[in-house]
Amino acid sequence: MDALEAPELLLLPHLSALTPKTGFLIGLALAITAYCYYRHTQHPLYKFPGPRSAAWSNVLYCYYYIQGRQPFKLLELHNQYGSVVRTAPNDLSFNTAGAFRDIYNFRPGHETFIKSDWYDGGVFADKAHSIVSEREPGKHGHMRKYLSHAFSDKSLKAQEPLIDEVVNEFVSQLDVFGSKKGGIDIVVWFNLATFDIIGSLAFGESFGGVKSGEVHPWISRIITAIGQSALADAFKRFPKFATTFKWLFPKAIEKMLEDTAGHENYTISLIDKRLSNPSTRPDFLTRMLENRPEDLTDVQIAAHASDFVIAGSETTATTLSCIVYYLTKNPSVYQKATQEIRDRFERFEDINSTAASQLKYLHALALEAMRIYPPLPLALPRVVPKGGDTIDGHFVAEGTIVSVNPVAACLSTKNFDAPLEFRPERWLESDLVDDHEASQPFSMGPRACLGRNLAWIELSLLLSKMLWVYDIELLNTEVD
């Protein structure tokens, strides 16, 4: 037998000459090639468009998330690839109203799209889940049932004097601090007000920010923690990166853990203080305790209260800041808003949430602000149930992580005409151009924001009272 009859004999000398290191590298290269081939041609999501690197790695996803630019990158990708984009090996992003309904809303005959493990990072002390972090639908429904009493129309009406107390002090303090040369940073002051309101309702006492004009240290810690959530998600997607990061930056990890423990301990101390002093004050805790089930522990009450503070403060302040910015940039919009408020109320004392909620232009202002600058710009990831399901006409395999990014949806020319223009009138006119349902600042379905009515009360009272009393202008003309 010669080499022509057995060509494999020609390879044997070369193969036997390979060093273990070379063999390993060749094997690794073949494995990577096979992996990439599978991700691009055989994976259940291979047919969906997106950057090639997203098919085989989470690097692109995490890079922009940690940078804080992910929402705008997703807008760019949707403009390039269409209404559905593969953003990671097992992730799809959508940007349509239909996808909002299919992913988040209740659909008869369809299984629930449960929250992804992204929410596991929100577990409180002693592994207590809250209304936000609980992923199991049955347990979440149980929580929502006993918490809903605190957010009912009757409860919110009883809570309005507590809200008004902060709002009125806010208006007074604007005169004290705003009369100084250089004006005030209204973003800071809106945060002081909304944190004070939610503190009063969640813990029975405000943080005193409006009175002092200073940010409470605990609030600074919360805002920092929100920014760290991106790093936590990256650790989940790259466990080895997490190990390396902890080894390279032990002090940074230690600081993060200390901040988390400090936040939890302070929250628990506030709850313990409130529980030790029974009160009929019509706040969240009173309503929660009135309807307290046997399985609701003190730590879990603290977890819920923590969620209320995080979800119900900075988001509202963001919307208020956005409104004021566009009011100062658009004289005609400013004139319409102030005229509506000042024509409606003869006296400052006449302004209340019921009357303010009937101000149509003010309502449109808020809707447009939440569209052009979503207060929660991050997508809320869900998992496609067993057997797969259809989303906006696309069949998606089970186990896929799916979501709608608010920025990608609200700033898409497919959903809104001239999406970068601040145009409150789009919410007052009947037109066939804008798809209003593509903007869902409070989400929808069984996991929709429990405090949306509270948010509307805060928005309407703070804006109407401030604009009834003051004329405002943007002093820093370089702000854009």
Swiss-Prot record:
Identify the cofactor(s). Answer: heme
Q: Which residues are glycosylated?
A: 265, 352
Q: Which Pfam families match?
A: p450
Membrane spanning stretches: 9-29
Q: Which InterPro entries match?
A: Cyt_P450, Cyt_P450_CS, Cyt_P450_E_grp-I, Cyt_P450_sf, Cytochrome_P450_monoxygenase
Subcellular location as annotated: Membrane
What Gene3D superfamilies does this protein's entry cite? Cytochrome P450
- Which keywords label this protein? Glycoprotein, Heme, Iron, Membrane, Metal-binding, Monooxygenase, Oxidoreductase, Transmembrane, Transmembrane helix
EC number from the UniProt entry: 1.-.-.-
EC class of the enzyme, as a word? oxidoreductase
Any GO molecular function = monooxygenase activity
For this chain's UniProt record, which GO biological process terms are given?
mycotoxin biosynthetic process
Task: Tell me the pathway.
Answer: Sesquiterpene biosynthesis
Q: Which GO terms describe its cellular component?
A: membrane
- Residues bound to heme are 449
**Function of the molecule:** Cytochrome P450 monooxygenase; part of the gene cluster that mediates the biosynthesis of PR-toxin, a bicyclic sesquiterpene belonging to the eremophilane class and acting as a mycotoxin. The first step of the pathway is catalyzed by the aristolochene synthase which performs the cyclization of trans,trans-farnesyl diphosphate (FPP) to the bicyclic sesquiterpene aristolochene. Following the formation of aristolochene, the non-oxygenated aristolochene is converted to the trioxygenated intermediate eremofortin B, via 7-epi-neopetasone.
Q: Which family does the entry's similarity section mention?
A: Belongs to the cytochrome P450 family.
Mind telling me what this protein is named? Cytochrome P450 monooxygenase ORF11
Identify the species of origin: Penicillium roqueforti (strain FM164)
Query: Which gene is the coding source of this polypeptide chain?
Result: ORF11
